[in-house]
Every structure is written in C-alpha cells, then in structure tokens.
Amino acid sequence: MIFASTLEASAKKDGFDWEPVMNAIIQIESKGNPMAVNGSYVGVLQISPVLVKECNNILKSSGSNKRYSLADRFNATKSKEMFVIIQSFHNPLNSVEKAICLWSGGIRYNVSKTQAYLRKVMRLMN
C-alpha cells in the first residue's frame, strides 16, 4: 500500500481537506506552473531538495517503500502528495496556520518571519 495514498485517504476520512491551502500556496509560489524554478525550489509548490529528502525519511520511518525523486517536484500530483506527507508528520493536528507557516519557513520556522506569507495565503483562501 502506498503511504501517501493512505495519508490522503485518512485526511479525507477525517473530513480535512488540504486542497484549498495547497491551491492558495500554488497561486503564490508558481501561479500553477509545474515547471516553475526559483533556485533550488521547483514545481507548483516550489519544493526544495531538502523537503524531498524529509518526505523520503518520513516514508522510510513508516515502513513504506515509496520514495520521491527530485524530478517528482515537477509533477503537481506528486508535489501535493509531498505536502500532505509533510503536514501529516509535522502538523498532525491539521492547523492551517501552522501548515502555511511551515511551508514558508521550513520545519523550524520563525513565526514572526512567516506572518506576511501567512496573510497572503489566507487572503487567497477567503
């Protein structure tokens, strides 16, 4: 069984839908362009190599054989799967605010440094 699919199924079963958050972030990060590149950040969600490695570490620790490649960042569906994996592990209570700040500032984000990004994403969601 694929871990990412299990996570997505679990999120839907719990009634939580990351789609509005992901769609707002996608508009800010890449305007929906799966080929968008900004330094080491690429794809619709502007995923870094560090984030791919973190997803693979989470998958490995869960016993899954699934792994993501750097090229997967250019695939919108796989990018969204990686978003869900990161949130399921680092944001298990599904806090939208934490999800946005985590995406902007990384796993050890600074709250004050992520507030402008948080406001941008929240405006797009409303």
Language-model segments: residues:
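Sec-dependent N-terminal signal peptides
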Residues: M1-S5
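Catalytic glycan-binding domains that act on GlcNAc-containing polysaccharides
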Residues: T6-N126
